[in-house]
Amino acid sequence: MKNIIITGASGFLGAKIYNYFNSNNLVCSVGRSLNNNVICDLSTNIPVFSNIFFDTVIHCAGKAHIVPRTQKEVNEFNEVNFVGTKNLIKGIDSIPKLPKSFIFISSVAVYGVDEGILINEEHVAKPKTPYGISKKLAEDYIIAWGKKNNVKICVIRAPLIIGKDPLGNLKFMIDNIKSGRYLNIDKGRARKSMVLAEDIISFIPVLIKNEGIYNLTDGCHPSFFELSHLIAKNINNKTVHNISITFAKVLAKIGDFIYFFFKIEMPFNSLKLKKITASLTFDDSKARKIGWKPNCSLSKPSLWLD
C-alpha cells in the first residue's frame, strides 16, 4: 500500500489518519490551508494533481454536523460535503491512472433516524437534516463513480467519533462535567453509539482491500450515565447530578416558549430533550465479518480521555 491522497488532513479524524499513514507511506494532503500538498478549496475548485499518482483516496473533508441557523449554513453543507466531493472526483478523473480504492468517511446521519436500536446497513437511508442529505448525496455519487470506473469504494458510516482532544457533544459533556454544570436527565438511561478514532484508522488497511458500506462502532453503546460517570471519575471524582424527566420537560417548554415569542435560540428545548433521552445505536456486525475488532470506549478511557 503506497501513495495515499487524504482530504481534511487538518480535521479531527483526518489529522490522525494523516499522521498514522505518513510515517510509512507517501501521503498527499488536499485542502485549503497552506500546509497541504495540494492547496484547494474543494467546495469551489477542482484540485490539480500534477505528477501525483496514488493507489488510495481517503476522503475525510467535510462540514461537521451542526444545527444550521441560517440558509447560508444550510447551503454550506451541500457545497462542502457534496459539491466538494464532486470536485475531488473531477480532479481524480483528470489523472492518467485512477486509484484502486476510495474510502469515504460518511455518517450515520444518512439513516435519518433519531431513535432506534442496532440499526444496520440494510436500513433505508432517508436523511432529514442538511448534513445527512449532503453526506448521502456524496455517498451515491462516489459509489456510482466507482462502479463506472472499477474503483473499490468503501463507505464508513460513523456515529460520534471520539479520541484525544474531542470536538462537539463529547467536548461539551467533558467541559461541563469539569465545571460542575453537567446534569443527566432521567438517570442517563439513553444509549448512543460511538467509535474510537484510533480504531477507524487501524482498520483502514482492511477497508482498502474491501468494498461496501460499513457501520463502525465500539460495540459498547454506552449510556449517558455510564459515560458521564466514567468521565467524572477520571476528572478528580467530580459528582454528576441528575434531574427528573418531568423537570426536564418543564425546562424544555421554557426554551420552546422563548424561541416562539422572542426568536431567541435556547441551548435546551423539546427537540434537544428528545435527542438526549432517546437511545440510538448502530449494528457493526457486517464490519466484524471482515475483521473489525474495536476497543470498548468504557474499558479503554485512556484512549480518549486526558
Cite the ranges covered by each PLM segment.
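Flexible, glycine-rich beta-alpha linker
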Residues: 111-112, 154-172
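Active-site Tyr-X1-5-Lys
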Residues: 128-154
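NAD(P)H-binding glycine-rich loop region in Rossmannoid oxidoreductase-like domains
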Residues: 36, 42-80, 87
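Conserved Rossmann-fold NAD(P)-dependent oxidoreductase catalytic core, especially the SDR/UDP-sugar
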Residues: 87-130
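Amphipathic terminal alpha-helices
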Residues: 282-306
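Substrate-positioning beta->alpha
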Residues: 166-172, 186-211, 215
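Mid/C-terminal beta-alpha module of Rossmann-like enzyme folds, strongest
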Residues: 207-267, 303-306
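N-terminal Rossmann NAD(P)H-binding glycine-rich loop of SDR-like oxidoreductase domains
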Residues: 4-22
